[in-house]
Amino acid sequence: MNKGKFYIRQAAFSLLLLSFLNAESQTAASTKYPQGYFGNPLRIPMSLSANFGELRPNHWHMGLDLRTDQKENYPVVASADGYVSHIGIRPSSFGKFIIVNHPNGYSTLYAHLNRFYPELEKYVREKQKEKESWAIELDFSEDDFKVKKGKEIGKSGNTGGSQGPHLHFEIRDTETGRSLNPLLFGMPVHDNVPPVLIKLAMYDRSISTYAQTPKLFALKKAAGGYIIPKMPVLKTGFNILSFAIRAVDKFPGTQNSNGIYTARIFQDEERIAEFVLDEITYSESEFINAQIDYRFYKAGRGYLQHISPLPAARGKIYHVSNDDGLIRLADTFPHKITIQVGDANDNFSTINFLLQFQDGIDISRPVRSSDKNFIPGYVNIFEKTDFEAYLPEACIYDTIQPIYSRSDATLPNAVSALHQLKDNSYPVHEEMTIKIKPTVQIKQEWRDKIVIQRNAGNALLKPVWQGEWLSAKTGAFGSFVALVDVTPPQINNPGKGDTVDLSPASRIVFTPTDNSGIKSFRAELDGSWLMFTNDKGRSWIYNFDEQCPYGVHHLKVRVADLVGNITEKTWWFKRYPYTPPKKKIYNKKKASKKPVKKKK
């Protein structure tokens, strides 16, 4: 591994070098995929609330979100013939989902389901009981659960990380697992509306993108395309530069703003760089933080998408015609710049303007030249008396100037100083290792009760001891302090009394709390495992079923936290048929009408 001082590691670009096919549109990628093979996975017309490649925190959206009229339990059907190859139940993610393999080498995924079709639901329930786990992943062979195109495979829902009823639908390459843009397969979605261009951003690429605030230009739609108002010639003091775009895609008949598919930039008619969101793997998805201006986004200013790649943007969405995809101005003549932004249906919007170098304007504040700068593509090591950080080669996307501070921790259970290394407005790709040396002697019985808190409770890391140091992996810069946690979790009571009366209830809900976070939850009813769901994160829920018949029962709940503190509580409860009391209806007496005296 190398440890170096150079701003750009040339090898970092080797994964980006792809030649352009000048005579063909990149959006003609749809010809690579079978057209009309996959049908609508719903029995209502397809309407998109989100498309492939949409920008999300730390990932691109990997499929289509299909509206279900803001309702649950619509039939979800197989998009083509095949067999169920995998099911999963993932809290705060896909929820209940199905993967179907098809004979043409592709797979489809259907997520946020309320339930599977009856035969599959019954089988999964048996496996959950066998494994004593609600969250589960199961693989199947070709002969287990075959499906036909249009066969109902489940009901739509709002499970997992879903924020409202809808169906998440993906098409994948079965062999590689790459998620593919479903709109390239001729899905029945009408679209003749080009993207809307909002803002253009310009960067000085002689320095790190993290060391500057981009120059912003509002865009205006005009005859023949978009323009930068009142600026026929854009003059700049940058002779090596790049652009980013804020743009959204639109579909007919909806006001939704969706993600764009591609953006490309030309200098004097030569294509310099582009990105295309046609295929992405989940392992590549976090590279979105290299495609956007991450610091601009973290400041709450929205998304800007880089048209040219950052030095260590190793994802495969970029294509460049030179070593780095950057604009170079070697003279003071005006140069024609064209930017095209398109969707997956070949609807394009275009910006044309002249770009001219003029010395002495747009002066950037350079990054201080230092051997201590964090350089992408190299191992970077940061060392202080009681704090260290180790950044692997694939940790960062552009040069970062480290800023560090140390202060006394104020939390009563702190066992180290508070260490601040940059802040979380700088993205981290591959996790870095941080090490902290405690400032106090740790009791032997407390050594396994230590957590490292990042950013005032935003995340808790479980460290391991390395001699006198605590070591942990982290996916973000920020503040770090070591804390001791000897307080066990707290568990709420399901009701009052020695024998809780749950006859009026339809379910039992526990929402345990803890200083370091809940690691495990287990419930037993009359000595047997009882399945609680944990779909949305904090609460564990059991809906009464055949496992809990009417009568008196014994319930035991055991909760463990991140460092191994355990709380166990038991209750007796009773449950009998219950009829809610009838509401009393009060009849209002009609006011008597007094006779009206006639005037004499």
Spans of features found by a protein language model:
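Proline-centered linker/hinge motifs at extracellular inter-domain junctions
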Residues: 192-198, 486-490, 581
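Short edge beta-strand/loop segments characteristic of extracellular beta-sandwich folds
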Residues: 244-248, 435-439, 507-513
